Amino acid sequence: MAKLHDYYKDEVVNKLMTEFNYNSVMQVPRVEKITLNMGVGEAIADKKLLDNAAADLAAISGQKPLITKARKSVAGFKIRQGYPIGCKVTLRGERMWEFFERLITIAVPRIRDFRGLSAKSFDGRGNYSMGVREQIIFPEIDYDKVDRVRGLDITITTTAKSDEEGRALLAAFDFPFRK
């Protein structure tokens, strides 16, 4: 079992119970899933780019990514409905906790010119989204084998009812918010 999951059960739940005066342990917000999304717009011209992006995402997450397709045709972007334009992975359970731990302890501190993550990236319902400009911050990616530096979106979905609860949940994990 991931250390962070044990830490959540032992420490974070008690801390949030006292902070927000919850009546039941089930009211305490928890991390539900983490979604990684990589949009590869250049895949229209070269299908190999999408395969490389999917391989990178598989290495980062430890799970085979789902290829996302265009929902509708857009002439300005030269895409048609059904064209493969990206890939995504939804992590839950044990893999989610392991990824979350690697994200906080290893990957985020390796971001170039890192001064902390914005605390304003909550969606109003306690979910947090962040963008990563380079996939090479993850130790699973071999820098020499990278054909192109790509970014990805990371969304942390929680059961929190408000941004305040979501921020308290992530802060309890020592999430590196900007001061």
Curated annotation (Swiss-Prot):
Its GO biological process annotations read: translation
Read off the InterPro entries from this record: Ribosomal_uL5, Ribosomal_uL5_bac-type, Ribosomal_uL5_C, Ribosomal_uL5_CS, Ribosomal_uL5_dom_sf, Ribosomal_uL5_N
Highest taxon above the source species: Bacteria
The UniProt record lists the keyword Nucleotide-binding? no
Q: Which UniProt keywords apply?
A: Ribonucleoprotein, Ribosomal protein, RNA-binding, rRNA-binding, tRNA-binding
Task: State its role.
Answer: This is one of the proteins that bind and probably mediate the attachment of the 5S RNA into the large ribosomal subunit, where it forms part of the central protuberance. In the 70S ribosome it contacts protein S13 of the 30S subunit (bridge B1b), connecting the 2 subunits; this bridge is implicated in subunit movement. Contacts the P site tRNA; the 5S rRNA and some of its associated proteins might help stabilize positioning of ribosome-bound tRNAs.
Protein name per Swiss-Prot or TrEMBL:
Large ribosomal subunit protein uL5
Organism in which the protein naturally occurs: Citrobacter koseri (strain ATCC BAA-895 / CDC 4225-83 / SGSC4696)
